[in-house]
Amino acid sequence: MQKLFIVLLLFCILRLDAEVDGRTMSHCNQSECQEKCKKKNKNGRCITEFEMNYVYNRCRCN
């Protein structure tokens, strides 16, 4: 019974993780973002934006 509980718990955790990852539309790499913005003589950072039911991780140059 305890093994069944552990299996169900892991299944729920993995499913939740997949749902969260499935709603992230774009990923931002901080080092790539800084390099991209450095060419424009600006500072770059990754920001998180929410639009509808999706999450966007974008690079923003300031």
Swiss-Prot record:
Nucleus in keyword set: no
Location(s) in or outside the cell: Secreted
Top-level taxon: Eukaryota
Cellular component GO terms, alphabetical: extracellular region
Tissue note: Expressed by the venom gland.
Cysteines joined through disulfide linkages: 28-46, 33-59, 37-61
GO molecular function: potassium channel regulator activity; toxin activity
Role summary: May block potassium channels.
Domain commentary: Has the structural arrangement of an alpha-helix connected to antiparallel beta-sheets by disulfide bonds (CS-alpha/beta).
Record-stated family: Belongs to the short scorpion toxin superfamily. Potassium channel inhibitor family. Alpha-KTx 23 subfamily.
The protein's name: Potassium channel toxin alpha-KTx Tx308
